[in-house]
């Protein structure tokens, strides 16, 4: 019986879809043929695709001022919802475009309808459901049961259906939008990255349609920056194409790839610099022709009347009939011909076409969907500054998502290479946010901040092409500041040169963007790690003097990951980075180390006994030996070097070393020179006091 039952069970018919089917590998020849035909079809419709995306970009922009009018929803709730949607997106393994389209649907709906606090999560999940239907395949679309489970049964299945109908009717059933992923792919394709993969059909491990390692790395870092831009309010008012272009430039700069900078340079030269140079040449030629004709007519005037002013007053008075004769004489003297009415049919057509071209939309270039002009270039630099500020607010969900891909390590290396510039941006973020949010002063951003964004982006340099404002700023900076040679590529003939990425610090001592501009430095949003340079645990002397009581709840992100490079480094108040030192007479603010010059060291002998006690009382404000080292001595990466080329040890002795000033930044060198001058004056005054005291006791 057992054998018969087993046979019957084996012969039972199973209904439904088959289970546990092994996937067969797709044939490489078919894959290569499909890839080639797909690329051929896309190239035929490339112009139509770009034009459609540019039209959708202008139609689907979100006004953040309308979201400000929401009675219950606040901007600090956005990161919480976004973290939840990122977790859902990664758990369902949806396409990257789905997440960006979901956020656009949420913002467009919140800009038109009032959303209550209890329905904010319902709107987000329904928008993700709509976007997955629009972008992903059917098997990846989450079901209503899964959405209710993810929301912990806070909403019924019918509520998702009702909210879907309400969102679609509010948006007039127009869901299409050029997402950040679409614009990012256009920007990466314009980089012309070399494809390292081969079309070898026999090698099945390498697919012909797989991107190269370079393009995949650029895509990962740029996608991280695009997702980071979703957290802030400012990026809603900027076209997504410019955000994607900035993310592409910044990712190539982080990976030290020059392709994006080269393509941007070629575009700017073709579309901005060359037309302006042609206009300038035409204007110069027209002005020169006018001057030459004027000189020739002046030379041809043989009958010039030389008379006094009194004689010219009554000249031709009463001879009104001679006006026509005077006009005829002037006409033959100048030999000018009025051709206002002598135009042909072709010339009239050309004039009408030029007039109509002025009212046409700007010409679309492949990554720039909103047009390429000087305003778009300036907005790219602003977006770069805002992305650098957003790097200090990375949430734990976003960092875990990209940690396995190596994106976090790339950003840490980028921060360590440009830490002085990034630190200055963090110091002046309040000024930057005020100027960006203010509509009247939108274009009045500090030139040093713009220059720092150019360094971070590896922005192409144009030595011949500078605007009038940049010429004035560069000339005033060169006159006011005397920077050492070797920086920014400016030697003896280094005027009007922008800073190169090889010199990470682009600031001078006379600038308002000093590293310690504010008396209270900003508390880092993310706690520093134990291995970082600016960590509180990196130095043994820094254990008991610091506390985290200064942290408050004003941050707009829910949970921050402890990555030291994302947090703005905090310069201590007593470090060498301070731009202005106090006077020598102030005993509380400045402590002088007990030093003796090499020339007077053999002649000065301080006796032991009660004289030393008096001397210690008299010079109690002078710190001696190891007591002089404050808790912030280990902060600066540049050690303090004395004027005679010797390093000061903790015991008060000297060890002769080579006087090698740090060449990392001109700001540090200028501040060190000022500090050394003050220290030298203090040594001279101190040695004279010791000599006077020694002679008095003798």
UniProtKB/Swiss-Prot annotation:
Chain segments carrying region Disordered: 1-21, 277-326, 469-577, 599-619, 659-698
Compositional bias, Polar residues, is annotated for: 277-302, 493-520, 528-567, 659-669
Listed Gene3D superfamilies: Cyclin-like
Tell me, what's a Pfam family for it? Cyclin_N
Single GO term (MF): cyclin-dependent protein serine/threonine kinase regulator activity
> Which keywords, in A-to-Z order, does the entry hold?
Cell cycle, Cell division, Cyclin
A biological-process GO annotation: regulation of G1/S transition of mitotic cell cycle
Q: Which domain of life is it from?
A: Eukaryota
Query: Acidic residues: which segments have biased composition?
Result: 310-326, 469-480
Indicate the transmembrane segments per the record: none
CDD domains to which the protein is assigned, alphabetical: CYCLIN_CCNO-like_rpt2 (cd20537), CYCLIN_ScCLN_like (cd20559)
Job of this protein: Essential for the control of the cell cycle at the G1/S (start) transition. Interacts with the CDC2 protein kinase to form MPF.
UniProt lists the family membership as follows: Belongs to the cyclin family.
By what name is this protein known? G1/S-specific cyclin CCN1
């Amino acid at each position: 019986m057992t054998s018969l039952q087993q046979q019957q069970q084996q012969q039972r018919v199973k209904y439904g879809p088959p289970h546990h089917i092994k996937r067969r590998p797709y044939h490489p020849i078919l894959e290569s043929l499909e890839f080639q035909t797909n690329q051929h079809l896309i190239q035929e419709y490339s112009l139509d695709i770009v034009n459609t995306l540019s039209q959708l970009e202008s139609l689907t922009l979100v006004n953040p001022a309308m979201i400000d009018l929401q009675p219950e929803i606040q901007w600090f709730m956005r990161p919480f919802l976004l973290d939840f949607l990122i977790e859902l997106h990664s758990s369902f393994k949806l396409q990257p475009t789905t997440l960006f389209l979901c956020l656009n649907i949420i913002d467009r709906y919140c800009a038109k309808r009032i959303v209550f606090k209890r329905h904010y999560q319902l709107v987000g999940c329904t928008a993700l459901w709509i976007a997955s239907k629009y972008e992903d395949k059917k098997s990846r679309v989450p079901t209503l049961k899964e959405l209710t489970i993810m929301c912990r049964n806070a909403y019924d299945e019918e509520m998702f259906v009702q909210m879907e109908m309400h969102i679609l009717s509010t948006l007039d059933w127009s869901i299409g939008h050029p997402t950040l992923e679409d614009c990012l792919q256009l920007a990466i394709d314009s980089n012309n990255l070399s494809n390292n993969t081969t079309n070898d059909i026999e090698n099945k491990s390498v697919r012909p349609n797989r991107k190269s390692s370079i393009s995949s790395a650029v895509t990962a870092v740029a996608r991280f920056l695009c997702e980071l831009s979703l957290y802030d309010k400012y990026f809603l008012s900027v076209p997504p194409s410019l955000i994607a272009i900035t993310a592409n430039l910044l990712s190539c700069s982080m990976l030290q790839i020059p392709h994006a900078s080269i393509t941007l340079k070629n575009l700017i030269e073709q579309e901005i610099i060359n037309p302006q140079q042609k206009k300038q040449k035409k204007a110069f030629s027209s002005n020169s022709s006018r001057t030459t004709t004027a000189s020739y007519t002046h030379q041809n005037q043989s009958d010039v009347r030389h008379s006094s002013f009194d004689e010219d007053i009554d000249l031709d008075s009463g001879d009104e009939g001679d006006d026509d004769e005077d006009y005829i004489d002037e006409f033959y003297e100048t030999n000018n011909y009025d051709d206002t009415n002598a135009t042909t049919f072709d010339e009239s057509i050309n004039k009408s076409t030029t007039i109509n071209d002025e009212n046409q939309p700007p010409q679309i270039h492949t990554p720039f969907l909103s047009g390429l002009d000087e305003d778009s270039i300036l907005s790219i630099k602003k977006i770069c500054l805002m992305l650098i500020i957003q790097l200090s607010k990375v949430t734990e969900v976003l960092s875990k998502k990209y940690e396995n891909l190596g994106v976090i390590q790339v950003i840490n290396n980028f921060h360590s290479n440009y830490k002085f510039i990034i630190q200055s941006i963090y110091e002046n973020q309040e000024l930057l946010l005020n100027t960006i949010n203010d509509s009247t002063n939108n274009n009045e951003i500090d030139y040093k901040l713009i220059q720092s964004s150019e360094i971070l982006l590896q922005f192409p340099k144009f030595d011949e092409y500078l605007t009038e404002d940049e010429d004035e700023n560069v000339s005033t900076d060169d006159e006011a500041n005397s920077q050492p040679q070797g920086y920014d590529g400016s030697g003896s003939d280094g005027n009007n040169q922008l800073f190169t990425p090889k010199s990470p610090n682009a600031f001078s001592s006379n600038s308002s963007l000093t590293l310690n501009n504010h008396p209270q430095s900003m508390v880092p949003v993310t706690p520093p790690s134990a291995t970082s340079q600016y960590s509180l645990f990196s130095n043994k002397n820094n254990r008991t003097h610091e506390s985290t009581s200064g942290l408050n709840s004003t941050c707009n992100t829910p949970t921050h990951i402890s990555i030291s490079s994302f947090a703005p480094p905090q310069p201590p108040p007593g470090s060498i980075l301070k731009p202005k030192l106090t006077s020598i007479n102030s005993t509380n603010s400045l402590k002088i180390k007990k030093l003796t010059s090499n020339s007077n060291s053999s002649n000065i002998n301080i006796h032991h006994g009660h004289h030393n006690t008096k001397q210690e009382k008299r010079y109690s404000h002078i710190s001696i030996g190891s007591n002089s080292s404050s808790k912030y001595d280990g902060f600066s990466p540049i050690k303090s070097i004395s004027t005679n080329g010797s390093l000061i040890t903790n015991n008060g002795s000297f060890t002769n070393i080579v006087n090698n000033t740090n060449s990392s930044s001109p700001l540090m060198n200028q501040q060190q020179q000022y500090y050394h001058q003050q220290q030298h004056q203090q040594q001279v005054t101190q040695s004279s006091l010791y000599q006077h005291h020694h002679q008095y006791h003798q």
